[in-house]
Amino acid sequence: MKYAVEVNNNVEIFEINKVAKQAAGACLMKVKNTVVLATVARENTQVEEDFLPLTVQYIEKQYAAGRIPGGYIKRETKPGDFETLTSRIIDRSLRPLFPKGYAYPTQIVVFVLSADPEIDLQVVGLNAASVALYLSDIPMKAPVCGVRVGYINDSFVINPTNSELQNSALDLYVAGVKDEMLMIEMRSLPNMNGENQNMNEFSEDKMVEAIDFASKAILAGSTAYENTFSALKKPDAALEYKPEVEDENIANFIEQNFTSDVQAAINQMAKSERATELDKIVNKIMQSETAIQNEWQKNVVSNIIGKFKRKIIRSQIINERRRADGRALDEIRPISIETNILPNAHGSCLFTRGQTQALVVTTLGGETDAQVSDSLTSNTPISERFMFQYNFPGFCVGEASPLKSPGRRELGHGNLAKRALTPSVPLNNPQVIRTVSEILESNGSSSMASVCGGSLSLRAAGVSTLKLVAGVAMGLIFEDDKHAILTDIMGLEDHDGDMDFKVAGTREGITALQMDIKLGGISLEILREALNQAKDGRNYILNLMEVANDDIIINEEILPKIEIFGVDPNKMVDIIGQGGKTIKELIDKYEVSIDLERDSGEVKIQGANKINVENAKSDILNIVKKSNDFKKGSKFGHHHERKETSNFQVGEEFDGVVKKIMDFGAFISLKDGIDGLLHVSKIKTQLSEGDTLRVKVEEIKRGKISLELCE
């Protein structure tokens, strides 16, 4: 059965009961040429964990873009960062919908089967998963809807195409149910205005306006899904739910005899994310005569202690306007900043805020150091020239846990910090940048400490960022008709609060925002109040960062030296040499990296030794000069160049064979041993060496043949 839903600038086609019929819920969703399969599977036996056993996996199939996976093993293996981050977005959007006490292991799988380059896979992926979950026998009050908002030509645009997003100043992703927002992710998108770069920060009022715009689209989408699929939803399964552990006798006993102990534990927990102090109280209660006589269960006592702790913390904040560590609601923990503490690192910053500490280190590299990855919606590999990586070892919270490869949380926090800092990094920066945040202590807000430390680490490495960027984690607590907004939350407040959101930006506005809402609806006025309080906190931190910035001593001696100059693009072949021999010899001889831009003739040389860089430049200029002298002094040289292309005419068509694929295009073998260049901008599909293409001569200039694809 096919169902069409026309909403939020998309015509969405859903096919129900066609595929994956043994899953608890499934749907095939199509938007233009994008096709996504979403399935939900549920076990029939509960588990004992005290958390929701939900797993979300978003997987992109390479055949969706007509490709065969690269590498030695020709199949999809470990998910890429984009897949992992998208899985996390779907998880954060759907997790709040599950009923309280639900403890059945549940898996949501999203397969991208066909990818249209213009369609937003994250929006389609979430909405397909939402409909599949709503159709299942798991009780859901309404389907989630996810939307993306752009800001193009001074207007908000709902669900822009990928091409439109390239011209947007805003990338806002919001998910919710009806009029309740559940998850928000935002970043500003920098662009060039002539020779000047705009960071495109968003003011607090403009941000509220954008979220309001998104919320109306979510209401329309969620309502449309409910109206379309409510009659198709499976009957709710007869599930058992873990009851809320309530025992009035135990609760009264704890309140009468252990209030001071719990309060002392809260004071201690304000300094750490670990709950060891509460465990001690539980053990103490279990050893009491009352507990032994009444045969109290340890897990029940532990649960009630946790609730009592939560009650005390929230009561202090709401009624006494006082936090567990004695701070005012808008007070930031003490901050200390040290820069360039690592003598052989290009740039470093040790940023400490209370019991959260991040050592952030920046390294500068050449073009070959960029992270290259494939995307289903791009015909050419994506080169990531600014990387931000976040590490969270167990010792930062006092745990003896094994060091593993980064998980979803680490990737998510690193991505947030990267989004916050990217607008400040010059788009024309000549070097590849890798910034790493090592969390050495954690008691809340480690991702925002990474942003602050990262901004100063970039400056310490000599990167001329446009502005300093600071971040602060905020919290929100609701009790009846009262609310409290907290600045710079610690782990305790994050755990027992109703909402946490992280805001990063400059004095002029917000560059990145992430919000997870546990309580459902939040008014725009409270949201505006929270963002303005975050702005005050951000400006306070920026004051301290500016002082630290003035004290930075850049270690020029260890920074890589770079020379950028131009040559005649036609001389690139002489610099490279036959089979790359000449350029390889220069790289080995002078221990430098050399990057050539064949279209513009730009040459970029980078190395640790200034003299070596200058000598490499001198050698390249000599190669170019000798080539020029040879052309001037040799009639044969000129005649030979004309002869090579004399048999070709502009507009002439050939069946050419792909001979070599480069980052700037593909060399196509034509006839008589002559090659032509098909520039990357003309390539519409993934190419492989040996492919046959119908091409046309577009231009013949200085003995070089430029090609285009035949229609």
UniProtKB/Swiss-Prot annotation:
CDD domains: KH-I_PNPase, RNase_PH_PNPase_2. Mg(2+) binds at D494, D500. One of its GO terms (cellular component) is cytosol. Residues 651-710 form the S1 motif domain. The keyword DNA-binding does not apply. Residues 560-620 form the KH domain. One of its GO terms (biological process) is RNA processing. Keywords: Cytoplasm, Magnesium, Metal-binding, Nucleotidyltransferase, RNA-binding, Transferase. Belongs to the polyribonucleotide nucleotidyltransferase family. This is Polyribonucleotide nucleotidyltransferase. It comes from Campylobacter hominis (strain ATCC BAA-381 / DSM 21671 / CCUG 45161 / LMG 19568 / NCTC 13146 / CH001A).
